[in-house]
Amino acid sequence: MLRWALIFFIIAIIAAVFGFGGIATAAAGIAKILFYLFLVVAVVMLVSALLAGRNITR
């Protein structure tokens, strides 16, 4: 799950480059939305990975 958090974080960074950098002005609004969406998903995956690691009992 930690790997997925890293993947979503990288996607968020790429969306930020396009959205905030002005490279693609036509898609800037969509890229900004995708940045925040994938950033939230990355944080959720990171938190769930950390919580799942703590709850392992054998």
UniProtKB/Swiss-Prot annotation:
Pfam family, one: DUF1328
Subcellular location: Cell membrane
Topology class, membrane: Multi-pass membrane protein
Membrane-crossing residue ranges in chain numbering: 4-24, 33-53
One annotated Gene Ontology cellular component of this protein: plasma membrane
Keywords: Cell membrane, Membrane, Transmembrane, Transmembrane helix
Family under the similarity heading: Belongs to the UPF0391 family.
Protein name stated in the entry: UPF0391 membrane protein Gbem_0127
The organism of origin for this protein: Citrifermentans bemidjiense (strain ATCC BAA-1014 / DSM 16622 / JCM 12645 / Bem)
